[in-house]
Amino acid sequence: MAKKFTQHRGIVLPLDAANVDTDAIIPKQFLQMVTRTGFGRNLFYDWRYLDAEGQLANPDFVLNKPEFSGASIMLTRENFGCGSSREHAPWALTDYGIQAIIGSGFADIFANNAFNNQLLLVTLSEQQVDELFQQVAAQPGIGFTVDLESQQVQAGDNIYPFAIDPFRRHCLLNGLDAIGLTLQHDADISAWERQQPSFLR
């Protein structure tokens, strides 16, 4: 069973960029692995490091700034996750420790891949996202609370309601991935199989 997401509070990582594509999230040279772990170190590799070997950190990139160490909520702009479909993108984000991303829009294929990997995407208006960026700029290292049960983001004294597909909300709240959903009907599946002719079993 996947991990349940009900409510999460964490340090906010402000990635103030629009149209961040999946090749920026996890470059193609790291796509050979097929397990979900080990991708976090290579998240935003080309922006995060100044050398090809990944030994020299870029001090100006947000992931390398000490005030955002341990961040688990990302704040970004519109059309995050555009470009080619690669499930490695949410793998890299979750392996790094990101549990929720707040933005003003997400690419459809990325959104599907994120959901399949229990990564919550919260869509707010551009004005609301601007307000959140202003809060983080005024107080680097600030924490927000993302509450999936009440469908709202708490940022300081401000509350931002958000909408989410009811089915996806149900799955995230209950820790249900594709396998978990199937196992909910295990008894029905077994009963159907027993009814089939022996030559079909």
Swiss-Prot record:
It holds the Pfam family Aconitase_C. Keywords: Amino-acid biosynthesis, Branched-chain amino acid biosynthesis, Leucine biosynthesis, Lyase. It comes from the Bacteria. Its EC number is 4.2.1.33. It catalyses: (2R,3S)-3-isopropylmalate = (2S)-2-isopropylmalate. One of its GO terms (cellular component) is 3-isopropylmalate dehydratase complex. It is an enzyme of class 4 (lyase). GO terms for molecular function: 3-isopropylmalate dehydratase activity. Heterodimer of LeuC and LeuD. Belongs to the LeuD family. LeuD type 1 subfamily. This is 3-isopropylmalate dehydratase small subunit. It comes from Erwinia tasmaniensis (strain DSM 17950 / CFBP 7177 / CIP 109463 / NCPPB 4357 / Et1/99). The gene is leuD.
